């Protein structure tokens, strides 16, 4: 486990930057090249979004269940680091889960209970107070996690990664531990959720943890075009800083199941559907305009914030997911920037099982 106090974190950051700049004296020229390449990708996202089109790939569950997934779609998923997989569960079943969760919240008098850890963790990410419920083991959640359709979905996604090499298996793509997470139930008109853009799976760890250093070695060597974001090597060894609401387990993909109809404007998920943004985020602190002790949105025990101050180019590519229906699922790579719309302008509850 990484145990850093703020002073140690700052000292290590200063040393890290000095060593990097000494090793790569022409780094800023290389960074300009990276910026140009990312600008091209971001402009495509902007253009498609202005036309009402999404660059987040979509796939029907029954296609990969029957082995009928076009290689072009696979390429799009890996390039964007995200995908909407439709019809994983029947609509009526997802709607029944939603009703059972509403009943569960009332029967357990949820609103009178203390909900501490999440609020502290998201203290720099929220506009006000998240409407994400600290409920993990309801019947609906357990059924969704253990369903055969979910197992097939996760297996398909896991197999997009390089999970073994030279006889070493980094993880088993068809076998997972049960991962318990929360639920979202957001009422129409709500303006309090507003999770600003961020990445999970650590913040300062991405620069200072030895396993992450090996994971991102090509990026830190400024050979960004050689970096493989789907390599399972080393990433599973990364250790997270202790925090009340941080998942320290290795996750190939993060995701949720829709329990209600929701789309742009409905207070739902936003993504930057571009897997290459991780190189920009890791390299941005190395530029001379950043104070030596600053890692551009990274603080111990917090999610990695992506802000207008340091990442304005990337935020141009932040888009809402396409409309999804109950039973659809949405997935994104652990290095993909994501957030939640500030305002729910829709007419019905926006609800998901994480």
Segments the model singles out, each with a brief description of its role:
Residues 1-79:
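Fe(II)/2-oxoglutarate
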Residues 83:
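Short acidic/polar active-site loop segments enriched in Thr and Asp
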Residues 258, 272, 332-333, 354:
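Generic beta-strand/beta-sheet core signal
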């Amino acid at each position: 486990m990484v145990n850093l106090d703020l002073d140690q974190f700052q000292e290590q950051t200063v040393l890290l930057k000095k060593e990097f700049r000494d090793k790569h004296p022409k780094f800023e020229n290389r960074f300009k090249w990276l910026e140009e390449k990312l600008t091209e990708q971001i402009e495509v996202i902007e253009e498609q979004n202005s036309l009402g089109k999404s660059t987040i790939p979509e796939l029907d569950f029954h296609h990969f269940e029957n082995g009928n997934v076009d290689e072009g779609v696979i390429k799009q998923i890996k390039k964007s680091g995200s995908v909407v997989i439709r019809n994983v569960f029947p609509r009526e079943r997802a709607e029944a889960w939603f009703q059972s969760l509403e009943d569960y919240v009332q029967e357990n008098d949820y609103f009178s209970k203390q909900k501490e850890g999440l609020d502290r963790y998201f203290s720099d990410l929220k506009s006000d107070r998240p409407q994400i419920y600290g409920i993990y083991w309801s019947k609906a959640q357990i059924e969704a996690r253990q369903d055969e359709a979910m197992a097939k979905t996760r297996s398909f996604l896991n197999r997009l990664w390089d999970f073994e090499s030279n006889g070493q298996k980094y993880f088993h793509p068809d076998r997972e531990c049960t991962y318990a997470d929360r639920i979202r139930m957001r009422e129409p008109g709500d303006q309090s959720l507003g999770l600003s853009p961020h990445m999970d799976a650590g913040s300062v760890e991405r620069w200072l943890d030895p396993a992450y250093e090996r994971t991102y070695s090509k990026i830190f060597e400024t050979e960004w075009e050689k970096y493989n974001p789907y390599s399972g090597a080393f990433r599973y060894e990364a250790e997270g800083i202790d925090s009340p609401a941080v998942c320290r387990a290795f996750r190939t993909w993060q995701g949720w199941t829709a329990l209600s109809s929701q789309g742009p404007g409905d207070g739902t998920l936003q993504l930057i559907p571009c897997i290459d943004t991780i190189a920009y985020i890791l390299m941005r602190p190395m530029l001379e305009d950043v104070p030596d002790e600053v890692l551009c949105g990274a603080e111990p025990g917090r999610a990695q914030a992506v802000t207008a101050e340091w990442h304005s180019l990337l935020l141009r590519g932040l888009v809402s997911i396409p409309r999804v229906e109950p039973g659809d699922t949405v997935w994104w790579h652990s290095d993909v920037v994501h957030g939640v719309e500030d305002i729910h302008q829709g007419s019905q509850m926006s609800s998901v099982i994480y």
